[in-house]
Amino acid sequence: MKKLAVIFPGVGYTCTKPLLYYTASMAAERGYEIIRLDYGQDIHTFHGRTPTELEPIIKLAIKRTLPQLENVPFSEYDDIIFISKSIGTTIACQLETALQLKGKVHQFLMTPIPSTLRYLSDINGLFFAGTADPYMPESKIHAAARNFPDKTGGIFEGCNHSLEQKGDTLGALKNVRLIVECLDKMLV
């Protein structure tokens, strides 16, 4: 069985940070080929966070990501999972459509941004969010969980955009472990 995991980082949250590093490691352990995307250093150091500021950054990231994926023979894979964080969640959902992979991809969305929520009705997958995420209002997180209970992987009370609580290293490690265990259940 041929399997692929594509890793979509956030703005400052690169593929070497804990949530993406360990989810990619688990996918590799389960026999998935790993593609780690890079949007460019200017995007990884971008400081804007409002939807208006993020929209052109997302478009630029997609423009830079498409060439990294255009020669991937997606039809040859038996299972494809998009593992994403922050703006990567919106990029992953948009690319599922742009690459004509609707229904062929499992989405694993960590700390989605508000623009990702509109895709929840169309995806096959799970999302994970913290209630103290400064980029996602808590009310939107709970509404998404109510509207899409089968797509809610976990809501982390009091956790920020990295699914951590300041000053609680052991709690952060526990959250990473819980997320990796959820991913492991999705992998074939």
Which residues make up each language-model segment?
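Acidic catalytic loop of the alpha/beta-hydrolase fold
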Residues: 131-136, 161-162
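Active-site nucleophile loop of the alpha/beta-hydrolase fold
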Residues: 10-11, 39, 107-116, 130-132
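Short beta-strand/loop motif that positions the catalytic acidic residue
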Residues: 121, 127-129, 133, 141
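C-terminal alpha-helix
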Residues: 178-188
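Short alpha-helix in the alpha/beta-hydrolase fold that links the catalytic acid
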Residues: 20-21, 136-146, 168
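Primarily recognizes the serine-hydrolase "nucleophile elbow" in alpha/beta-hydrolase
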Residues: 63-122
